[in-house]
Amino acid sequence: MSLEDAFSDGPAFVPYLAAGDPDYESSLEYVEALERGGADVIELGLPFSEPIAEGPTIQNAVVRSLEGGMTPTRFFEFVEDLDVSVPLVCMTYYNLIYRYGDEPGPRPFVEKAAEVGIEGFVVPDLPAEEAGPLREACDEFGLDLVFIVAPTTRGERLDRIMEQVSGYVYVQARLGTTGAQSSVSDQTDSSLERLTDYDVPKAVGFGISDGDHAERIVASGADGIIVGSALVDIVAEGHENGDDAETVADRLETLARELEDGAVAGASQRPPHPERT
C-alpha cells in the first residue's frame, strides 16, 4: 500500500514512535500495538544525536533509543522484524542518510530502506532547496519524500516544498518543536486553508494528544493526524515505572483507538472530500 492510498478511505491516523525506545524487543511490541489501535501509516524515528525539530519528550526517547544501541543498520533490522502491514515512514536527519554506506550520498540509504519495506521519509533538517539528491534517490526506488510545512511557510517557498513533496505533507499545527498540548492551535485552520489548492494529502501534527484534538483537526479539513509526543509519553512513563511491555502496549493501543475514533468523528462533520485525480 502506498502512502497516498493510506489516505484514500478516510482520515489517516499516523502515529510516531522512536525505534528501539526503550529497548529493541519492547519497541517492536509498541509499534505493532499502534497498528492494532487503528494506525494507517506509522512514522518510525531513526534517532540522531541532535534532533533539532523535537521537544523534550521525543528528545528523551531518542536518548533512550541511542543508549539501547539503535543505529541505522539496527534500524533496518528492526523494520524487517516488525509484523505490521501498514506503510512505514522513516523520520530521521539527513546526516544519517548521507553518511550511510561506502560512499557519501543518500542513494545507499534509500536503496536499503526500500529493500526492507520503508515507503517514505520525513527529514526535518533538509530544506526543499537542498533536497534534490534525496528526491532523485526516492524517485529511483519508488519512495515518497514528506516535507513539513510551518504556519509561516508561504509564497515561493511553499510552492517549492509542494513541488518536491509526495505521499503526504506534514502540516505543523503551531510554531515550535513537537510536544503534546492541551488545546489545538488556531493556526491549524489557516495552515490548511493555505494548502487547499495543492493536490496532496495534508496530515496535521505537532501537539495532538487526544481524541478531541483529532476530531477538531479533521473537521477543519485535514486528511490525517500525526501524533508523537502523547504516545511517547506512555512509553516513557512505563519505562520509568518498570511496567511490563504488554501493559504499555495495551495503553498505546487504547490511546491509538481514541485518536482514530476522533479522526473518524471529525470526518463526519465536513462535506465529502473531492476525488483526487
From Swiss-Prot:
EC number(s) from the headed UniProt entry: 4.2.1.20
Any one of the GO CC terms: cytosol
Highest taxon listed in the record's lineage: Archaea
Mutant lacking the gene: phenotype: Auxotrophic for tryptophan.
Active site, UniProt feature: E43, E54
UniProt pathway annotation: Amino-acid biosynthesis; L-tryptophan biosynthesis; L-tryptophan from chorismate: step 5/5
InterPro entries membership: Aldolase_TIM, RibuloseP-bd_barrel, Trp_synthase_alpha_AS, Trp_synthase_suA
Molecular function via GO: tryptophan synthase activity
Enzyme class: lyase
SUPFAM superfamilies hit by this protein: Ribulose-phoshate binding barrel (SSF51366)
Keyword line: Amino-acid biosynthesis, Aromatic amino acid biosynthesis, Lyase, Tryptophan biosynthesis
Regions annotated as coiled coil: none
Catalytic activity: (1S,2R)-1-C-(indol-3-yl)glycerol 3-phosphate + L-serine = D-glyceraldehyde 3-phosphate + L-tryptophan + H2O
Signal peptide region: none
Subunit structure: Tetramer of two alpha and two beta chains.
Function noted in UniProt: The alpha subunit is responsible for the aldol cleavage of indoleglycerol phosphate to indole and glyceraldehyde 3-phosphate.
Similarity remark: Belongs to the TrpA family.
Name of the molecule in the record: Tryptophan synthase alpha chain
Species assigned in the record: Haloferax volcanii (strain ATCC 29605 / DSM 3757 / JCM 8879 / NBRC 14742 / NCIMB 2012 / VKM B-1768 / DS2)
Gene: trpA
